[in-house]
Amino acid sequence: LDTFNWIVNAIVIAGVAYLAFAMALAGWIAGLRRGEAVTLLPARGDGAGTLAAQLGLVLASLVICAVLFYLLWIPLPLAVPPAAAPALAAGGLVIFVAGTLFIVWARRTLGRMWGISTSRQVKLLPDHQLIAGGPYALIRHPMYFGWWTALLGALVIYRTWILVFLLAMSLVVFYRRAR
């Protein structure tokens, strides 16, 4: 059981790390350098001040999230029979991986049309094209759906209050943003 839990945790951590860094932060920095991403602060000169300020904001947000995770990593009051725990973890892992793969599929389908908006307004590229293939043929906001699915999978695996909070908060925030 310990080896199985370790494998589940390793897959979840690797998936979260990939989504958080490779897709978001790396793409965001590349977009800022190309002048394609929306920024929180107006550009100054060559944009180095903006990039440094935004990276500072990202790092501060990560610290706040780490503190919240530490404080709210409280198990839900759900009794799971020890014999059912591996099946529940495996089911949660399948849901988590499906959500993660859906996000990756949606991101790859967007190609260069993808960018991270750090404001309430989405900045369209000059040669913007509506993407209607891949997962976008199935659902209007597949990256949001994939995120919710991955969070649901993590909730099934770990059953903690922080994941309930994140899922509820992201449902509200993404729903409002999508409208």
Where are the regions a protein language model picked out?
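Membrane-anchoring alpha-helices and their flanking helix-loop junctions
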Residues: L1-L125, Q129-A132, T149-R179
